[in-house]
Swiss-Prot record:
SUPFAM superfamilies: FAD-binding/transporter-associated domain-like
Gene Ontology molecular function, alphabetical: FAD binding; oxidoreductase activity
Top-level taxon in the UniProt lineage: Eukaryota
Gene3D superfamilies, per the entry: 3.30.465.10, 3.40.462.20, Uridine Diphospho-n-acetylenolpyruvylglucosamine Reductase, domain 2
Position of the signal peptide: 1-16
Keyword Signal: yes
Annotated FAD-binding PCMH-type domain residues: 93-270
Enzyme Commission numbers on file: 1.1.1.-, 1.-.-.-
Annotated organism of origin: Arabidopsis thaliana (Mouse-ear cress)
Residues of this chain annotated as glycosylated in UniProt: N76, N161, N280, N364, N419, N463
KW DNA-binding (keyword) present: no
Name the UniProt record assigns to this protein: Berberine bridge enzyme-like 6
InterPro entries: BBE, FAD-bd_PCMH, FAD-bd_PCMH-like_sf, FAD-bd_PCMH_sub1, FAD-bd_PCMH_sub2, Oxid_FAD_bind_N
Protein family: Belongs to the oxygen-dependent FAD-linked oxidoreductase family.
Gene: FOX4
């Protein structure tokens, strides 16, 4: 980049005062060069040297914390494949790219993380950072240039401070582990995060993780009060050392700024007894009408009540027929009696009965939301399944005004065309989400949204991949008239390569602005500026990372 700039300066110095045809060619060359310089941000080119990378790792760690036993060299061995697949949660990406993936570093100590960052950078090797492996597009463990995976799953400690009602959680800990640890300390403390217990805390929190407590308490990043991060120079920084601009960026801006080691989070107070319910309404039972009414009330209900709607395709009432069942899941921070009062007054169309309601502790609600049957032991939240046999694709949208019934019917018609399992998830906004400024953290999707949509499809047969992805694009296109626009907003934690991406080894700023404006809205400029300050050579990058661009 520096050499290109010097070259451009040389051209300008050679321009004569009076332009002739030759000088005009030079002027054109200058302009083209300047455009390329501004449009592409690349790290200084260093030819990848894996041998020196390994040597560097050994030199930068101590005998007390040796790194050699956490290095898995990429080969076709059972050991390496197990290391790769164990935290590859999307079967679409379960086959490693042996031509580009050089090794997996499953760090067990902070020095392993520091050494991996410094040695990868100095030896021209790209770094991908993986905690739980739930990246929808595989960006945390896939690349088309020589790279290593820094796997954080061994760094999973959780320290709850009951008196201060906060906790330190390392990036490799799962949400299930965090929930159990909190419950061991107190039955009336909780953390507002997601429903999948195997998701890693590192990526979930850094992308602005949401969950069923969001209307009452907000999302994960609203409760982060400190963090530990390894920067591009291998330095360990906390909030005080990194500064407020970087601390702001990592709360919702993802992994473009460094490697998150741990988060310090505030815990929230919940009652001893919560109430949950699950009610199904098929199209034949008036599901479309009830869902339309849900759009009118879900974001206006008391903050303590969260009702999400999941339309999905199921077998119809007759053999060979298919229909849509809208599944309403809910959680109320209180007893059944109070919940029934609210529902009878605000949403009687659902026809909720007392027999549908179940009172339980907060920890047991996490089992309910993870679709475990009643009576499942809490210890299952600590499980880390070694493989995932399902391929999936997700997309997201934000809805500002109710989708008309005709629009919903168009969605159902398109869903029937899928050969694979397909569902939508409507998560309501309102409550405290309307009261937190869009600029409070890097996560911008706040006031003005009725609900967020997640589109999901899953399949087992690898031969169904192409058709499943094509159908998702068709469904997304059908939904376009009914969702946000200019830009069409997207949720960063639901990575979607279709909304814009860059090649693995370079970052086109114009392309980055396309996907970046959808994920981060007006916060993108500030994020690019922070990136330019802390990672000017763009070392921490992937197909949808934030480019380093100084913004005046």
């Amino acid at each position: 980049m520096k050499e290109a700039f010097v070259f451009l300066l040389c051209l300008t110095n050679k321009f004569p005062k009076k332009f002739n045809s030759c000088s005009k060619k030079k002027e054109t060359l200058y302009v083209l060069g300047l455009v390329l310089l501004v449009s592409f941000i690349e790290a200084p080119v260093t030819k990848p040297n894996f041998g020196k990378f390994i040597e560097c790792l050994r030199d930068r760690t101590t005998p007390e914390n040796p790194i050699t036993d956490v290095i898995s060299i990429a080969d076709n061995s059972t050991t390496f494949l197990s290391s790769y697949v164990s935290y590859t949660k999307n079967k679409r990406f379960s086959s490693p790219n042996f031509k580009k993936l050089l090794a997996i570093i499953a760090a067990k100590h902070v020095s392993h993380v520091q050494a991996t960052v410094v040695c990868a950078k100095s030896n021209g090797i790209q770094l991908r950072i993986r905690s739980g492996g739930h990246d929808n597009e595989g960006f945390s463990y896939m690349s088309s240039v020589p790279f290593v995976i820094l796997d954080m799953h061994n760094l999973r400690s959780i320290d709850v401070n009951l008196s201060r009602k906060n906790a330190w959680v390392q990036a490799g800990a799962t949400l299930g582990e965090l929930y159990v640890k909190i419950n061991e300390a107190s039955q009336t403390l909780a953390f507002p995060a997601g429903v999948c217990p195997t998701v890693g805390a590192g990526g979930h929190i850094s992308g602005g993780g949401f969950g069923n407590l969001m209307r009452k308490f907000g999302i994960t990043v609203d409760h982060v009060i400190d963090a530990q991060i390894i920067d591009v120079n291998g330095k360990l920084l906390n909030r005080a050392a990194m500064g407020e601009d970087l601390f702001w960026a990592i709360r919702g801006g993802g992994s473009s700024f460094g490697v998150i080691l741990s988060w310090k989070i505030n815990l929230v107070e919940v009652p001893k007894i919560l109430t949950v319910f699950k009610v199904n309404k098929t199209l034949e039972q008036g599901g479309t009408d009830i869902l339309y009414k849900w759009q009118l009330v879900a974001n206006k209900l008391p903050d303590s009540l969260f009702i999400t709607a999941w339309p999905r395709t199921v077998n119809g009432p007759k053999p060979g027929e298919r229909t849509v069942a809208v599944v309403f899941y809910a959680q109320f921070l209180g007893p059944t009696d109070k919940l029934m009062e609210i529902m009878d007054q605000s949403f009687p169309e659902l026809g909720l009965g007392r027999e549908d309601c179940h009172e339980m502790s907060w920890l047991n609600t996490t089992l309910f939301w993870a679709n475990y049957p009643a009576g499942t032991p809490k210890s299952i939240l600590l499980d880390r399944p070694p493989t995932n046999s399902v391929s999936f694709k997700s997309k997201s949208d934000f809805v500002k005004k109710p989708i008309p019934k005709k629009g919903l019917e168009k969605l159902w018609k398109t869903m029937f065309k899928f050969n694979s399992s397909v569902s939508l998830q409507f998560n309501p906004y309102g409550g405290v989400m309307d009261r937190i400024p869009a600029t409070a953290t890097a996560f911008p999707h706040r006031k003005g949204n009725l609900f967020k949509v997640q589109y999901s499809t899953m399949w087992f047969d690898a031969n169904a991949t192409e058709s499943s992805l094509a159908m998702m694009n068709e469904l997304f296109e059908v939904a376009e008239p009914y969702v946000s626009s200019n830009p069409r907003e997207a949720f960063f934690n639901f990575r979607d390569i279709d909304i814009g991406s860059n090649p693995s080894g370079e970052t086109n700023v114009d392309e980055a602005k396309i996907y970046g404006s959808k994920y981060f809205l007006g916060n993108l400029k500030r994020l690019m500026d922070v990136k330019a300050k802390y990672d000017p050579d763009n070392f921490f990058k992937n197909e949808q990372s934030i480019p380093p661009v100084r913004v005046k």
